[in-house]
From Swiss-Prot:
NCBIfam families: PRK00811.1 (NF002010), speE (TIGR00417). This is Polyamine aminopropyltransferase. Its EC number is 2.5.1.16. GO terms for biological process: spermidine biosynthetic process. Pfam families: Spermine_synt_N, Spermine_synth. Belongs to the spermidine/spermine synthase family. Homodimer or homotetramer. It comes from the Bacteria. It catalyses: S-adenosyl 3-(methylsulfanyl)propylamine + putrescine = S-methyl-5'-thioadenosine + spermidine + H(+). Signal peptide: none annotated. The keyword Protein transport does not apply. Residues 2-235 form the PABS domain. One of its GO terms (cellular component) is cytosol. The gene is speE. The lineage of its organism: Bacteria, Bacillati, Bacillota, Bacilli, Bacillales.
Length: 275
């Protein structure tokens, strides 16, 4: 008998993967958590029925969340990751030699626990001495912080359940306060095919708070539609105008210095969302 997992991405569309077995399933205090072993994409983390990451394509998302802001900022020392309990963004953050401390604030400790167990290649950096892992509410953490971080990365789930408030204007205002005077933040902002209005709203909210606001994209096969967006807000530095000398060699599979700029070249229908 064949086993297949389907993520219903809209009322009329979804993606399906053939699975070998279910590795773990649990209703945590915050969400339904499943880890499944798939034929095509390796181990897959699923939260509330939505694919969060897979062993095969995880590097695209994690590299694009981390390296775009970290190459934009000339000297990022203190970095905060909100969400991201799988550890992939933290792994990429630590590739930058200027980073002295990376704080991870994940609301659901079970995500951290089972990522370490079933996604070790992604969670590999969570025990690094430069990393401060806190099982806490990222929204509350931001509210208490002031001029504390050079770069903040919001690696949230979709805007449902505990992540809803991470897409609100008040949260972005809190981020601006938590950043240093030349700080940068980035957030994943879903896909333009099914959630164009969300992108439009988030971009407008961020633009009211940060003098430099940009949208960029990446191609992630297991995410809805495959085309994913990220919104970056900066107090000082423009990600479109990074001096070539600021780029240095790090080990990546997707990100390059040329792709850094190219990612901001938007399809017209996406660009129209933010005009």
């Amino acid at each position: 008998m064949e086993l297949w997992y389907t993520e219903k991405q809209t009322e009329h569309f979804g993606i399906t993967a053939k699975i070998k077995r279910t590795l773990h399933t649990e209703k945590t205090d915050f969400q339904q958590l499943d880890v499944i072993e798939t034929e095509e994409f390796g181990n897959m983390l699923v939260l509330d029925g939505m694919v969060m990451t897979t062993e095969k394509d995880e590097f695209v998302y994690h590299e694009m969340v981390a390296h775009v802001p970290l190459f934009t900022h000339p000297n990022p020392k203190h970095v905060l990751v909100v969400g991201g309990g799988d550890g992939g963004v933290i792994r990429e953050v630590l590739k930058h030699p200027s980073v002295e401390k990376a704080t991870l604030v994940e609301i659901d400790g079970k995500v951290i626990e089972y990522s370490k167990k079933y996604l070790p290649s992604i969670a590999t950096a969570l025990n690094d001495p430069r990393v401060d892992v806190q099982v806490d509410d990222g929204f509350l953490h931001i509210a208490k912080a002031e001029s504390a971080y050079d770069v903040i990365m919001v690696d949230s789930t979709e805007p449902v359940g505990p992540a809803v408030k991470l897409f609100e204007k008040g949260f972005y205002q809190g981020i601006a306060k938590a950043l240093k005077e030349d700080g940068i933040f980035v957030a994943q902002t879903d896909n333009p095919w099914f959630h164009g209005e969300l992108i439009r709203k988030v971009y407008a909210d961020v633009q009211e708070i940060f003098p430099i606001t940009r949208l960029y994209t990446a191609n992630i096969p297991t995410y809805p539609s495959g085309l994913w967006t990220f919104t970056i807000g900066s107090k000082t530095y423009d990600p479109l105008h990074v001096e070539p000398s600021r780029f240095y060699d790090i080990e990546t599979k997707y990100f390059t210095k040329d792709l850094h700029k190219a990612a901001f070249a938007l399809p017209r229908f996406v660009d129209d969302l933010i005009k």
